[in-house]
């Protein structure tokens, strides 16, 4: 990592309709990181995001829909002069069991449109991805429908634990530089 801050972007969809859905788990992690530092989000108009500036860290929640996440992420990188190597994108991941949390650098998008948009806008796949396992949809349910559904009651109880685990990984990554 260079001297620029680490940019952590929690992916999700804007608006009350999507609160508590699987696709918005990235927002949960962003909020956990900010609450740990007693910070708060404010609107960053240039990038159309809500951001919190913390020591060595900028946490963001795009105000765009998931499939267009790359544009605000690129705007933040340009504004704060952050290279893709200093970006962590937090996203829902169908290919991981529910409750699993995994940090990886580079690699594919696993069909995730928010990651596709980010890779296209940044011009590289070489940024960090913090994958939040939401599991596969039941039966023959369409994955696109599954990610837009709210978590079940039992799952909902585990979201704070997952968000805390993910925030721990970000803090460890920040400390290791």
From Swiss-Prot:
First-listed, main subcellular location of the protein, grouped into a coarse class: cytoplasm
Annotated EC: 3.1.1.29
PROSITE patterns given in the database record: PEPT_TRNA_HYDROL_1, PEPT_TRNA_HYDROL_2
Site (Discriminates between blocked and unblocked aminoacyl-tRNA): 13
Pfam family, one: Pept_tRNA_hydro
Residues at the site labelled Stabilizes the basic form of H active site to accept a proton: 92
Swiss-Prot/TrEMBL GO biological process terms: protein quality control for misfolded or incompletely synthesized proteins; rescue of stalled ribosome
GO CC, alphabetical: cytoplasm
Keyword terms of this UniProt record: Cytoplasm, Hydrolase, RNA-binding, tRNA-binding
Subcellular location: Cytoplasm
Molecular function via GO: peptidyl-tRNA hydrolase activity; tRNA binding
InterPro entries associated with the record: Pept_tRNA_hydro, Pept_tRNA_hydro_CS, Pept_tRNA_hydro_sf
Active site, per annotation: 23
Recorded catalytic activity of this chain's protein: an N-acyl-L-alpha-aminoacyl-tRNA + H2O = an N-acyl-L-amino acid + a tRNA + H(+)
Binding site for tRNA: 18, 65, 67, 113
Transmembrane segments: none
Family label: Belongs to the PTH family.
Subunit structure: Monomer.
Function: Hydrolyzes ribosome-free peptidyl-tRNAs (with 1 or more amino acids incorporated), which drop off the ribosome during protein synthesis, or as a result of ribosome stalling.
Protein name as annotated: Peptidyl-tRNA hydrolase 1
Source organism per UniProt: Corynebacterium glutamicum (strain ATCC 13032 / DSM 20300 / JCM 1318 / BCRC 11384 / CCUG 27702 / LMG 3730 / NBRC 12168 / NCIMB 10025 / NRRL B-2784 / 534)
């Amino acid at each position: 990592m260079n001297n620029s801050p680490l940019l952590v972007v929690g992916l999700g969809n804007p608006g009350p309709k999507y609160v508590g859905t699987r696709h918005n788990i990235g927002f949960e992690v962003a909020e956990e990181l900010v609450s740990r530092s007693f910070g708060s989000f404010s609107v960053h108009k240039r990038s159309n995001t809500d951001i919190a500036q913390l020591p060595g860290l900028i946490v963001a929640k795009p105000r765009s829909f998931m499939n267009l996440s790359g544009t605000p992420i690129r705007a933040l990188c340009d504004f704060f002069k952050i290279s893709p190597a200093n970006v962590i994108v937090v996203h829902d991941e169908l290919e991981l069991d529910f409750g699993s949390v995994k940090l990886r650098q580079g690699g594919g998008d696993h069909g995730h449109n928010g990651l596709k948009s980010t890779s296209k806008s940044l011009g590289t796949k070489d940024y960090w991805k913090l994958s939040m396992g939401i599991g596969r949809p039941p039966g023959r349910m369409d994955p696109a429908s599954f990610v837009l559904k709210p978590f079940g009651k039992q799952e909902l109880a585990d979201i704070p634990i997952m968000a805390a685990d993910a925030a721990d990984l970000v803090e460890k990554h920040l400390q290791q530089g």
